[in-house]
Amino acid sequence: VACSLFAQKTPESKQKENIMKSKMFEKETFKKEVVENVKYLYRKTMDEASEQEIFQAVSYVVKDVIIDQWLATQQEFDKADPKIVYYMSMEFLMGRALGNNLINLTVYNEVKEALEEMGINLNELEDQEPDPALGNGGLGRLAACFMESLATLGYPAYGCGIRYHYGMFRQKIENGYQVEEPDNWL
C-alpha cells in the first residue's frame, strides 16, 4: 500500500479526477515516510544515513505519490481509448527528476520546509542526483520540450528511446590521446 502525503478533501470517486486540486500536503506523514524508507531500505537511522541514502529515501516517497497519479492517468486513458502519440528520439534531456517532480506536484516549498525541520537542506539533497546521461544537447532538449508540451496540453503520449546502460561517455586525455570511459549514471 502506497502512502499518501496528502489529506483527502473529496470523495474517493472524485479523487483521481482532481488529484492535485483535491489534496493538501501532510508534512508529518512525509517526514515519517522518509524516516521509514531510510530504515527499511538501508537499515539505518537518519543520523547514520548518507546524503545519497536520504536522497533515495525522499525520491521513493515522491515516487509513491507519482505512481498513484500515473496509474490513475492510465486508467482514464483505458476508459477513453484515445489515440496515443509515441515520440521516438535517441536523446531525452529531461533534467533532474526530484526538483521537477516536487514542482509539478506543487509541493516544493512544503517538502523543503519539512526537510528543514529534519535538518536536511533540499538544495544540497538535489545535488545528490546526477543528470541523466541521455543526450548531449539540442535534440535531447527538444525531445524533452515536446514531451512537456504534450503533457501540459493533456495529450496522451509516451517518449520512446534507448536506455543507455552507461549514458554518454566521459572523455579523458592520456598521453595526449583521447580515451573514452563509460559514464555510469544509473
Regions found by a protein language model. Name each.
Residues 16-186:
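A conserved ligand/cofactor-binding region detector
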